[in-house]
């Protein structure tokens, strides 16, 4: 307890009458002035700061190639947060609230976010409500709120269980229950259209002219073409990986050049170029040498793969690890040429990293988020130099989203 030995703190006999009232008023005035002089030094200027008459909400600058969005799903909490970050300075620009295990998508021009949400009438129970919000990336205010059927895939935060069409006119989301399906949303009309029936396939990779691909259990891709009413045609591709070549949960896919990159648990990377005319599968790449495989180098994390299109470089998050630990964080990024598989460099992150992403400009940054540190770390993607970081990103930040162009 702190006490102040000041005359004004001593109890005084109560004055009476008019004179007493004047004396009391004088005492109160002198006490106030004296107490002002006795303000503890440790309180600093805050206690005497003038209150603002008006408050305002700042508007973020227009999105650019180094705008970063970090999703904190809070380890299956009922609410999530999307942090908007200036990737050049690691400055926080804004936050957006979301529901349980949301899908976050960035428009090709960076002007809006699309967030597929799930909420319940009694927080963690009660009537389920699935909906889609479009968020202006400057004001962080909703520009559309679209009701969708309750059936969104809720097993984790996967990057490709929902996606914007390549022209940003439609949004596709995966339905898990009561049967496999893909929901179609018309973003121009701001309206849900239809659940399109699909076989037991997963992940959504959009291409031009209202086409998309999904990965099926037999190791093939299925191509779908849809019209404005949600009527579909489908055709399978060849099987491109064996049953025991297990693929990691989050592949990299570019809506702008339709390049699919998908690593296995052991560091083999399958690639394909997708288009309206079909899928062109490229020669797989082995990231690790035989010696590195013997030394137990394997990919690990949540978003483990990134791709810089202009430099034709693949970035794989990896570490020395036992089998079946592929969801645990890693401390290194291996960079290889996407065509030849030639090792270009290895970047030591010096942190337990869950997810990575790479900006698509001519001076790319490597972004790495850590659930443990609740921090987004930024590196020069070419020389690996640590540049900056921003911490206190919620409870368990685990995913990174950037504009594709």
UniProtKB/Swiss-Prot annotation:
UniProt record, GO biological process: methylamine metabolic process
Keyword Signal among record annotations: yes
InterPro entries assigned: Host-pathogen_enzymatic-act (IPR051200), MeN_DH_Hvc (IPR013476), Metamine_DH_Hvc (IPR009451), Quino_amine_DH_bsu (IPR011044), WD40/YVTN_repeat-like_dom_sf (IPR015943)
Catalysed reactions, semicolon-separated: 2 oxidized [amicyanin] + methylamine + H2O = 2 reduced [amicyanin] + formaldehyde + NH4(+) + 2 H(+)
Keyword line: Electron transport, Oxidoreductase, Periplasm, Signal, Transport
Major localisation: periplasm
Cellular localization per UniProt: Periplasm
Top class in the EC scheme: oxidoreductase
Protein function: Methylamine dehydrogenase carries out the oxidation of methylamine. Electrons are passed from methylamine dehydrogenase to amicyanin.
Quaternary structure (record): Tetramer of two light and two heavy chains.
Record-stated family: Belongs to the aromatic amine dehydrogenase heavy chain family.
Protein name listed in UniProt: Methylamine dehydrogenase heavy chain
Organism: Methylophilus methylotrophus (Bacterium W3A1)
Gene name linked to the record: mauB
């Amino acid at each position: 307890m702190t006490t102040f030995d000041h005359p004004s703190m001593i109890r005084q006999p109560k004055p009476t009458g008019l004179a007493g009232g004047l004396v009391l008023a004088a005492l109160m005035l002198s006490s106030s002035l004296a107490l002002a002089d006795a303000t503890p030094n440790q309180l600093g200027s805050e206690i005497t700061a003038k209150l603002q008459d008006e408050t305002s909400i700042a508007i973020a600058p227009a999105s650019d190639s180094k705008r970063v969005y970090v999703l904190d799903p809070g380890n299956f909490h009922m609410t999530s947060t999307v942090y908007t970050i200036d990737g050049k300075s690691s400055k926080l620009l804004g936050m957006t609230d979301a529901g349980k295990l949301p899908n976050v998508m960035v428009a090709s021009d960076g002007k809006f976010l699309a967030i597929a949400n799930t909420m319940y009438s009694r927080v963690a129970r009660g009537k389920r409500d699935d909906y889609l919000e479009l968020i202006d990336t400057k004001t962080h205010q909703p520009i559309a709120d679209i009701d969708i059927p309750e059936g969104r895939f809720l097993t984790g935060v996967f990057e490709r269980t929902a996606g914007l069409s390549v022209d940003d006119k439609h949004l596709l989301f995966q339905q898990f229950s009561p049967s496999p399906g893909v929901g179609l949303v018309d973003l121009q009309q701001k309206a849900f259209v239809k659940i399109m029936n699909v076989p037991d396939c997963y992940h959504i990779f959009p291409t031009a002219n209202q086409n998309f691909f999904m990965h099926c259990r037999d190791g093939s891709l299925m191509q779908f073409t849809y019209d404005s009413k949600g009527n579909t045609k489908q055709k399978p591709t060849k099987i491109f990986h064996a049953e025991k070549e297990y693929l990691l949960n989050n592949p990299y896919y570019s809506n702008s050049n339709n390049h699919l990159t998908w690593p296995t648990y052991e560091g083999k990377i399958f690639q394909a170029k997708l288009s309206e005319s079909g899928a062109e599968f490229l020669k797989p790449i082995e990231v690790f040498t035989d010696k590195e495989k013997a030394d137990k180098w394997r990919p690990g994390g949540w978003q483990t793969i990134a791709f810089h299109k202009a430099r034709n470089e693949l970035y794989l998050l990896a570490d020395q690890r036992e089998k079946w630990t592929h969801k645990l964080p890693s401390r290194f990024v291996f960079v290889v040429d996407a065509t030849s598989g030639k090792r270009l460099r290895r970047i030591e992150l010096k942190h337990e990293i869950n997810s990575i992403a790479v900006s698509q400009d001519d001076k790319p940054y490597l972004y790495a988020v850590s659930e443990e540190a609740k921090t987004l770390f930024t590196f020069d993607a070419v020389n690996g130099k640590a540049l900056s970081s921003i911490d206190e990103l919620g409870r368990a930040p685990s995913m990174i989203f950037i504009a594709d162009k």
